UniProtKB/Swiss-Prot annotation:
Species annotation: Rhodopseudomonas palustris (strain BisA53)
Catalyzed reaction equations: an N-acyl-L-alpha-aminoacyl-tRNA + H2O = an N-acyl-L-amino acid + a tRNA + H(+)
Name under which the protein is recorded: Peptidyl-tRNA hydrolase
Residue sites binding tRNA per the record: Y14, F64, N66, N112
Gene (name only): pth
Active site feature: H19 (proton acceptor)
Site note Stabilizes the basic form of H active site to accept a proton, residues: D91
Keyword presence, RNA-binding: yes
Keywords: Cytoplasm, Hydrolase, RNA-binding, tRNA-binding
Length: 201
């Protein structure tokens, strides 16, 4: 079994925010892979299904970003999951827009959702870091992630969500490098990444 956690803030006012791309990814996975309807539990919303023969539960914490770890801990305890079975999808300002990286453990780069999860369950869970770009100045970061994607950004966002969903079987199958490369190839094919970017770190 795998627990896929998408990070974001609940409520309509945050729905289109860059900080909510984790929620967006899970919504697309649930829709395209025929998951059960969303229901409230574990201080969040969950949907159940399978991808590539693997049982998967999707979790969107409704605790607000800074307390995401409480929901993740509740779900992990209930399903008796180890950290390698937990995959967190989140926005990453340290990556340019339309780039994606998968890693296990490591630093949290100031991301309060990751900070909360690490405090509750430990650090060695898998992260899908979805680049949303950096505003260039530290003081502008808060506003950047809590603003909606600009109209000009929406095509790459849609392409990213589609590529993540198309290749979700690789992600839940622990084939992280293949997943990362397939997503990058899809974004390259649509012109959102330079051909020289092979998805390597």
């Amino acid at each position: 079994m795998r627990l896929l956690v998408g990070l974001g803030n609940p409520g309509a006012k945050y729905q289109g925010n860059r900080h909510n791309i984790g929620f967006m990814a899970l919504d697309e996975i649930a829709r395209r892979h025929g998951f059960s309807p969303w229901r409230r539990r574990f201080q969040g919303e969950t949907a159940d299904g399978s991808i590539g023969g693997e049982r998967v539960t999707l979790l969107k914490p409704l605790t607000f970003m800074n307390d995401s770890g409480r929901a993740v801990q509740d779900a992990a305890s209930f399903f008796k999951l180890g950290l390698p079975e937990i995959i967190v999808l989140h926005d990453e300002i340290e990556l340019p827009a339309a780039k994606l990286r998968v890693k296990v453990g490591g630093g949290i780069a100031g991301h309060n959702g990751l900070r909360s999860i690490s405090a509750h369950i430990g650090n060695e869970y898998r992260r899908v870091r979805i680049g949303v770009g950096h505003p260039g100045v530290k003081e502008l970061v808060h506003g950047h992630v809590l603003n909606d994607f600009a109209k000009a950004e929406r095509p790459w966002v849609e392409a990213m969500l589609e590529a993540i969903t198309d290749n979700a079987d690789l992600l839940v199958g622990d084939r992280d490098s293949q997943f990362q490369n397939k997503v990058h190839l899809a974004l390259q094919a649509k012109g959102f990444l330079d051909k020289s970017d092979n998805g390597a770190k």
